[in-house]
Amino acid sequence: MILNEIFIKLFFMGMIFVVFSCATIKDEHYALIETKKGKMIVKFFPDIAPKHVESFKALIETDYFNGTTFHRVIPGFVIQGGDPNSKDNDRFNDGMGGHAGKYFGIGDENNSETWTVPAEFNEKPHKRGILSMARSQNPDSGGSQFFICVDNVPQLDNNYTVFGEVISGLEVIDKIVNSSTPGTENPSYRGPDRDNPIEKVEMNISLISSSELDLESLQ
C-alpha cells in the first residue's frame, strides 16, 4: 500500500516536471532577422541582460524594426542597425534615432522617444555573432540600435551590453558586411554615410518560440 502511494506521488511529480519543462521550452523566444541577404536566428541572454532583452522584444512586438536597415557595415568589426531613421531616404540621419521599448526610469515616462536602457555590462565576450547594444558615450543611452559582431572585437568587452547571439545564419553577416558602401567605392570619402550600404539592406524582425525553431530550414 505504501509502495503504491510512493509510486503514485512519484508519477505525478514526474508529470508536473514534464509539464513545467515543456512550458519553459515553449516560452523561450528567439529573434528571426530576415533580410534580402538571408535569415539569422538570435538567442537571447535574459539572465545577464534582462532589461535589454525585454526592451528588444517589446520593440519587435510592435514591428518597430520592420523596414529599418543595417546602416553601418564595417568588415572585421560589426554590422549595425535598428534605427527608425533608416526607413526614410535621408542617408545622413541614419544612426541618430531610436529609443527603448519600455520605460526603465530614464527619460520622460510620458514620452517614449526619450526612453533608454541602463547599461548591463557583463562578462560575455564580443566574439563573432554576438548581439550587443549600440550607445553614445553615455553608458545608459541604449535605445533601439544594435550591432552584431563580424569578428572577435575584445576592445568592446565590458563597454557595451551583450544580450544575445546569432546561432544560425552567420554567413548572412558576411554577406551584409561585404555590401558596397561609399567608403569601399571611394576610400577617401569621409561623409557620415561612409559605411552605409549603397543598396539598402532592410530587415524584418519577429519573435519565434523554440517549438517553431527549425534551424535546418534556415540553412
What function would you assign to each model-found segment?
Residues K9-V19:
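Bacterial N-terminal signal peptides
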Residues M1-F11:
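Bacterial N-terminal signal peptides that target proteins for export
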Residues F20-Q219:
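Cyclophilin-like peptidyl-prolyl cis-trans isomerases
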